[in-house]
Structure formats: C-alpha cells, structure tokens
Amino acid sequence: MFRCLMQNHQRRALVLFSGGQDSTTCLAWALERYAHVETLGFDYGQRHRVELDARQVVLRELRANFPDWAQRLGDDHLLDLGILAQVGDTAMTSDREIEMQANGLPNTFVPGRNLLFLTLAAALGYRRQLDVLVGGMCETDFSGYPDCRDDTIKSQQVTLGLGLGTRVTIETPLMWLDKAQTWELADRLGGQALVDMVIEHSHTCYLGERGQRHDWGYGCGHCPACALRKNGWERWVAGAAHAD
C-alpha cells in the first residue's frame, strides 16, 4: 500500500506545507526519506488563514517531539500570493457559501493554484538546491480539482524540468490514498505522537474554525474538508479496531 521509506541521502526536498493534515503527513514522509527537507507555504488571502499559524505550531512540535526529524528539517519559507484572490474569486478567498458550480467543480477551486504553487516551489528549489518537490495532491478523496490529478502533476514535472534545464521530481505520496489511509500513514510514520499532533495542531477546515474540537481535530465539521477528514478518521479507527 505504501511506498518504501528508505532514506535517500543524495537528494534534498522541498515540501509544500500548508499546515493541514495532508501536508503535515507529507512532511513527515519526506523527513523519514530525505536527509534535508525545507518547507514552503503560501499566503494567498485564504479564508482559513489560521492554517498559516498552524504551520508554525506543527513545525515547532515536529522539532520538539521527533529529534531525528528535527536534524533534517531545514528552513521554512512563506510566499505572498495575494494576487490569487484577484485572479480567482472563490469561496476559498471570500466569505461566501460553499457550493457546487455548473461545471461540476465546487466553488472552493482556485484556478491554477497548484500549478502556480509548484512553479514557485521549483524556482525556490532551484535556488536552494532542492530537487525534490513534495505535495499532498490526491486523486482518491478529493473534490474534483483538476490540478490535483496525477496526469496534471506528471505533466507539470516534465514542464518544470524542461523550463529549468535540470532534473525536477514531484513526489505525491498521498496520490492514491484515501483519507483513512492517510491517517494510517501518519500512524506508520510517527506513531500515536504524530497522529495526536495532526489532531491537535494541523488545520483543515475551509471556514477557519478552531473553536470546535472533535475526535479528529478542530473544524466546523460540515465543510467538504472537514467531512473528508472526519470520514477518513472514522473509517481508520473502525478498521484499526477491527484489526485488533
């Protein structure tokens, strides 16, 4: 089910790190695999800006609770992408009800977001000599975003390599995992300590709700992001209980 987590001491990684469940799990995956890992976040006027605070808390907790990973965890970077709110007026960047659109996509879809994220990550990685990009894109439990599809990511990898004239690898460890399997991967990587950290400190809720605590973490409990996280948690817990 999961890829082998052998360390690769020859390559350096840059993780697209929002502070959410998926990117936190991807960060742990990269820290287990690579000798040097840096993180990159984006401030694009997102409605759930609390995730920017969550990023720092997760990084702090990782350093404090996982000393081996702390030795491999390098600099954190944050880029201002306020222009995305101007280009794509969506429920992710404005106070409006989350709903499906006529094109079959939810209005939380920010056009070109992941394409821009990966382009900027590759440019930063080029300067920092980080030739592996790690992202939490996923085709299994996702909202239909076209820039999360495996074909999109593979195409972007080729384009970035050609445009930069160097080898670029985009790793997507969650691409074929559902949310229950993402919880399972976190447990496999860091045990209960990492699972607890994801619950307490990562942020997923599109509405930025941090006042309501659930078994699976904080959030409104109703938005699409919360629903995926909640359902994945319940399926993982049920599966673990059945295995016992």
Curated annotation (Swiss-Prot):
Its EC number is 6.3.4.20. The keyword Thylakoid does not apply. Signal peptide: none annotated. It catalyses: 7-carboxy-7-deazaguanine + NH4(+) + ATP = 7-cyano-7-deazaguanine + ADP + phosphate + H2O + H(+). ATP binds at F17, S18, G19, G20, Q21, D22, S23, T24, T25, C26, L27. Pfam families: QueC. It comes from the Bacteria. It is an enzyme of class 6 (ligase). InterPro entries: QueC (IPR018317), Rossmann-like_a/b/a_fold (IPR014729). One of its GO terms (biological process) is queuosine biosynthetic process. The keyword Nucleus does not apply. Its cofactor is Zn(2+). Pathway: Purine metabolism; 7-cyano-7-deazaguanine biosynthesis. Keywords: ATP-binding, Ligase, Metal-binding, Nucleotide-binding, Queuosine biosynthesis, Zinc. Zn(2+) binds at C205, C220, C223, C226. One of its GO terms (molecular function) is ligase activity, forming carbon-nitrogen bonds. Binds 1 zinc ion per subunit. Catalyzes the ATP-dependent conversion of 7-carboxy-7-deazaguanine (CDG) to 7-cyano-7-deazaguanine (preQ(0)). HAMAP family: QueC. Belongs to the QueC family. NCBIfam families: 7-cyano-7-deazaguanine synthase QueC (TIGR00364). This is 7-cyano-7-deazaguanine synthase. It comes from Bordetella pertussis (strain Tohama I / ATCC BAA-589 / NCTC 13251). The gene is queC.
